[in-house]
């Protein structure tokens, strides 16, 4: 059987041998691979960046000046399968330190060879170009090892014989000399130029003064013209302002008048509305109640009038009905009386003296009542007589006078009625 092996992205897994034969190799970067026991070999190689510090001491340049150069290089194993195979052939099984040592020696060799072809000034003054040249020369050799140079820079350049400092001093002296000469020439040129400038300045000043005077005169003339024009414009502006102000004032007054007219109209409208409101209020509070009261009184009067009319009509109808009833009653009574009289007349005619006697007897109580009416107010009657027989005589006398009175009243002669004859004449 076998095992499964894994590596991170900073390492490459190299699998060799196995079922694929003795020449079969596989490279796995940041992954996994299967390996058979006993017949498969598993190894790892780092892909991390390696920092190298190549240093070449006392290397003679093209001018024979011994200098020391130090640099910094960043290198790593390339991941292309072919180049990774080259790296595995060269460094598989070696430590990182051993790999760094091989690459460092290669870079230092190329650095020495390049230093011999350049001057100190070229190396010192153009370090970037020098580093680029080293990188271009060393890249093919380390590339055949499967190594890539990511960067190469010159860290320091110095020497033990003070060549660089002397070079700097000579250059400094030359620069100082050139500076002094330049200062002297500048001062000379400055003096000459100053004199020329003074002359030019005087000429220019004279011309300037002349021009200034002319300019001043023209300025004064222009000022006068400007002042005149300004005053004219001011007067015109003032006049225009006053006219405009008068117009604006007139507009304002017109606006005020219009506002007053509008206010008056509104006031009149308000007063008219107030009058209408007052009228409505008076109508509602006085006229309507008065009209209602008048209508009420009118209705009451009309009702009373109607009541009186109806009452009068009812009374008249009542009187009419009563009159009609009384007339009917009287008519009926009259008819009854007439019928009674007719019947009585017939009876009288039929019965003769007997009927007359009945009439007399019927009328006697009434006559007696009428005669005795004055006596109704008399409590008692006392007859004074010394002789007891005299009273009887008085009664007889009254009875004897009664027929005469009845005859005078009714026309009936009671003396001819047998019954009364017996009553008035007891001796017979």
Curated annotation (Swiss-Prot):
<protein>
    <recommendedName>
        <fullName>Flotillin-2a</fullName>
    </recommendedName>
</protein>
<dbReference type="GO" id="GO:0030139">
    <property type="term" value="C:endocytic vesicle"/>
</dbReference>
<dbReference type="GO" id="GO:0007155">
    <property type="term" value="P:cell adhesion"/>
</dbReference>
<comment type="function">
    <text>May play a role in axon growth and regeneration. May be involved in epidermal cell adhesion and epidermal structure and function.</text>
</comment>
<keyword id="KW-0130">Cell adhesion</keyword>
<dbReference type="Pfam" id="PF15975">
    <property type="entry name" value="Flot"/>
</dbReference>
<keyword id="KW-0472">Membrane</keyword>
<dbReference type="InterPro" id="IPR036013">
    <property type="entry name" value="Band_7/SPFH_dom_sf"/>
</dbReference>
<keyword id="KW-0564">Palmitate</keyword>
<dbReference type="GO" id="GO:0005768">
    <property type="term" value="C:endosome"/>
</dbReference>
<comment type="similarity">
    <text>Belongs to the band 7/mec-2 family. Flotillin subfamily.</text>
</comment>
<dbReference type="GO" id="GO:1904086">
    <property type="term" value="P:regulation of epiboly involved in gastrulation with mouth forming second"/>
</dbReference>
<feature type="lipid moiety-binding region" description="S-palmitoyl cysteine">
    <location>
        <position position="19"/>
    </location>
</feature>
<comment type="subunit">
    <text>Heterooligomer; Heterooligomerizes with ic complex of flotillins 1 and 2.</text>
</comment>
<dbReference type="InterPro" id="IPR001107">
    <property type="entry name" value="Band_7"/>
</dbReference>
<keyword id="KW-0449">Lipoprotein</keyword>
<dbReference type="GO" id="GO:2000047">
    <property type="term" value="P:regulation of cell-cell adhesion mediated by cadherin"/>
</dbReference>
<feature type="lipid moiety-binding region" description="S-palmitoyl cysteine">
    <location>
        <position position="4"/>
    </location>
</feature>
<dbReference type="GO" id="GO:0072659">
    <property type="term" value="P:protein localization to plasma membrane"/>
</dbReference>
<dbReference type="GO" id="GO:0045661">
    <property type="term" value="P:regulation of myoblast differentiation"/>
</dbReference>
<dbReference type="InterPro" id="IPR027705">
    <property type="entry name" value="Flotillin_fam"/>
</dbReference>
<dbReference type="GO" id="GO:0031410">
    <property type="term" value="C:cytoplasmic vesicle"/>
</dbReference>
<feature type="lipid moiety-binding region" description="S-palmitoyl cysteine">
    <location>
        <position position="20"/>
    </location>
</feature>
<dbReference type="InterPro" id="IPR031905">
    <property type="entry name" value="Flotillin_C"/>
</dbReference>
<dbReference type="Pfam" id="PF01145">
    <property type="entry name" value="Band_7"/>
</dbReference>
<keyword id="KW-0967">Endosome</keyword>
<dbReference type="GO" id="GO:0005886">
    <property type="term" value="C:plasma membrane"/>
</dbReference>
<dbReference type="GO" id="GO:0002020">
    <property type="term" value="F:protease binding"/>
</dbReference>
<dbReference type="GO" id="GO:0016600">
    <property type="term" value="C:flotillin complex"/>
</dbReference>
């Amino acid at each position: 059987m076998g095992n499964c092996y894994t590596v991170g992205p900073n390492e490459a897994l190299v699998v060799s041998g196995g079922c694929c034969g003795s020449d079969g190799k596989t490279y796995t970067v940041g992954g996994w691979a299967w390996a058979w026991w006993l017949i498969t070999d598993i190894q790892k190689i780092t892909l991390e960046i390696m920092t190298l510090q190549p240093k070449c001491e006392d290397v003679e340049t093209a001018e024979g000046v011994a200098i020391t150069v130090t640099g910094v290089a960043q290198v790593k194993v390339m991941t292309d399968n072919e180049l990774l195979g080259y790296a595995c052939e060269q460094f598989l099984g070696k430590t990182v330190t051993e790999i760094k040592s091989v690459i460092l020696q290669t870079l230092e060799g190329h650095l020495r060879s390049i230093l011999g072809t350049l001057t100190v000034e070229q190396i010192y003054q153009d370090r970037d170009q020098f580093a680029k040249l080293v990188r271009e020369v060393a890249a093919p050799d380390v590339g055949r090892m499967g190594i890539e140079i990511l960067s190469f820079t010159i860290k320091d350049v110095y020497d033990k014989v003070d060549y660089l400092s002397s070079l700097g001093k000579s250059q400094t002296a030359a620069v100082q000399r050139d500076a002094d000469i330049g200062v002297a020439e500048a001062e000379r040129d400055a003096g000459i130029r100053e004199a020329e400038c003074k002359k030019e300045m005087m000429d220019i000043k004279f011309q300037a003064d002349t021009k200034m005077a002319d300019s001043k005169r023209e300025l004064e003339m222009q000022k006068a013209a400007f002042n005149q024009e300004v005053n004219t414009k001011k007067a015109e502006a003032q006049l225009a302002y006053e006219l405009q102000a008068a117009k604006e004032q007139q507009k304002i007054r017109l606006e005020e008048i219009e506002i007053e007219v509008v206010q008056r109209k509104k006031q009149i409208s308000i007063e008219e509305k107030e009058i209408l409101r007052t009228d409505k209020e008076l109508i509602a509070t006085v006229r309507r109640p008065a009209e209602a009261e008048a209508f009420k009184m009118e209705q009451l009067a009309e009702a009373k009038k109607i009541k009186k009319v109806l009452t009068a009509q009812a009374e008249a109808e009542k009187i009419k009905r009563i009159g009609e009833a009384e007339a009917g009653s009287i008519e009926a009574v009259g008819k009854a009386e007439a019928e009674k009289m007719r019947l009585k007349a017939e009876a009288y005619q039929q019965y003769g003296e007997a009927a007359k006697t009945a009439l007399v007897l019927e009328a006697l109580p009434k006559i007696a009542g009428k005669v005795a009416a004055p006596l109704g107010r008399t409590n008692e009657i006392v007859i004074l007589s010394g002789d007891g027989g005299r009273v009887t005589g008085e009664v007889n006398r009254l009875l004897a006078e009664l027929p005469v009175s009845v005859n005078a009243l009714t026309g009936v002669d009671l003396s001819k009625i047998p019954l009364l004859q017996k009553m008035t004449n007891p001796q017979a």
